[in-house]
Amino acid sequence: MEMPDYCDYDGLGLAALVAKKAVTPLELVEAAIERIEQHNPVLNAVVYKGYDDARAWARGDLPDGPFKGVPFLIKDLGMPVAGWPRSHGSKFARGVVDAEDGGLTRRYKAAGVVPVGKTNTPEYGITGTTESAALGPCRNPWNPSHIAGGSSGGAASAVAAGIVPVAHASDGLGSIRIPAACCGLVGLKVTRDRTPNMPDGFDYALGNVVDNVVTRTVRDSAAMLDATGYPEPGSPYPPPPKDRPYLEEITRSPGKLRIAWSWETPNGRPIDPQIQAALERTAALLKGLGHEVIERGLGIDYRALYASRGPAAAANFAAGMGRLIELVGREPEPGELEPLTWATLKAGRRQE
């Protein structure tokens, strides 16, 4: 398959070609690998290349899911893939290799995707830019001198560069939304446990951290959420059931909505003029579509919110690190964790 043709399709489009036998899953995998080798030296979006496994999976009997045969990338953070390393963007975890797939990994594979590698992340995903000491900086394909955002920066960079049409991502305080905005993609933080990583996942940040994907089209995001967003027995936060498939939902008119917007910033600093202009254009567009659009303040004391949330988040992070320390078999040594990670770990242990 010619490279320009590969980039012309979203994930569902590629799966349709596979279904029609116009292309094989192996050909799609080779196209993705070719683009990794072409773009990754500049972008550093893909930090583990699982080419041999991907080729073997593509040659085998793939599940008949909506994304059958579509190349896929998994964020190198909290998402086990059997036989693949999981560094969490940290020097401390570099030797960790998972023995089996995680719960959500199995759901992605059941959707028919073919994982070809893992994507860049900041250390333990705790910053909004992807520049860890262990993995190096990830760059934005629209302008390599710019950041790709974080913590799912590698996923967003790879999708925006046309390496894959859809990639796994996760989000606690913007880790899907920030890189999606930086790279011009669709990025949705879903309700907690809408896509549970159970039964073997860890409840990071009291359900505040969720998994989903970044994509180039809304329909890919909807279809992947349909494929992975179903209840799991034992999940701590079962979400309300959906009314209908998301792929159907995006074709329906929402009717007239009441939409509030604000250009207040959580830290009280002035908003950038370009962002303010974009907000005003968006508000005008929504009003022109018939919605009721209201400008109003956030009504939230963010300083108080962060002050109360910080200790709980740090304690939860320390508990998660405890699981990793048990897996590695020792405590981290000086130089194996970045300063912010050390500080968060120490703060969390004081809460235990």
Residue ranges and their predicted role:
Residues A54-A133:
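Acidic/His- and Gly-rich active-site-bordering loop/insert found
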Residues K189-T282, I300, R323, L327, ...:
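A short helix-breaking turn/cap at a secondary-structure junction
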Residues E100-Y230:
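Short glycine/serine-rich loop segments
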Residues M1-K49, A284, G288-G290, K346-Q351:
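An N-terminal boundary/leader segment
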Residues G13-K20, L73, F92-V96, V209-R216, ...:
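Short, well-ordered beta-strand elements within core beta-sheets of diverse protein domains
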Residues F67-H88, T251-W263, A312-E352:
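Short helix-loop capping/hinge segments that flank enzyme active sites or metal/cofactor-binding pockets
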Residues A32, A54, S221, I259, ...:
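Residue-level signal for inorganic ion chemistry
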Residues V116, E292-G297:
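General small-molecule cofactor/ligand-binding pocket signal
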